[in-house]
C-alpha cells in the first residue's frame, strides 16, 4: 500500500513539473499564421524573416494589452525604418468580430489579426493547464530566433515597460547589425599570425 502511494505521488510530481515548465528561450521560431478579416488572407510570421519582430498576443478588452499596444505603436513608428516590425493577434472568443473595432479605436501602425487560443499556446510553449496572463509578448530576431518571451504578470510590464520594450528592440537591432556578413564562396581565408 505504501509503495502504491509513493508511486502515485511521484507520478503526480512528475506530471506537475511538466505543466510548470517555462518556454525554452532562445529557440527557433516556428511558422505562425495570424488570421485576418480579409477572407483567406493570413499574415505569415515567416514573411518578416530578416526583420526584428515583436509579436504580441492580446485580448482586445484588456487594459494592459491596450497600454502595451500603445507603446508598441510608438516603437513601430520609431524603429520601423530600421527593420523592426510589430505583429498583433487577439485570442479571445469572437476575436474576429472584436478586431475591427479595436483597430478603429487604437489605430495601430501594424497588422492586427486573430488566432484561436490553442494555436497560440502551442506557439508560446505554454501548458494548456496553466493560466495564460495577458498580454504575451515575444521578441524574434532577424534570424527567426525567439530571443525573449514575456507573460502579462512579468515585471517587464511594470512601471518601466516602455524602457524595457525599447531595450529589447535596440538589442535585437544591434545584435543583427553586428552579425558579420558571410564571405562569398571561394573567398580567401584569413591566416592567423603567430
Identify the residue ranges that each predicted region occupies.
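Bacterial N-terminal signal peptides that target proteins for export
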Residues: 1-9
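Bacterial N-terminal signal peptides
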Residues: 8-18
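N-terminal "domain-start" segment that seeds a small globular fold
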Residues: 21-45
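Short active-site neighborhood of thiol/selenol oxidoreductases, capturing the structured segment around
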Residues: 44-66
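Hydrophobic beta-strand anchors of alpha/beta hydrolase catalytic cores
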Residues: 54-55, 86, 137
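Structural microenvironment flanking redox-active thiols in thiol-disulfide oxidoreductases
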Residues: 66-107, 117-123
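Thiol/disulfide oxidoreductase modules built on the thioredoxin-like
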Residues: 106-108, 117-164, 168
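Compositionally biased, proline/threonine/alanine/serine-rich low-complexity intrinsically disordered stretches
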Residues: 177-194
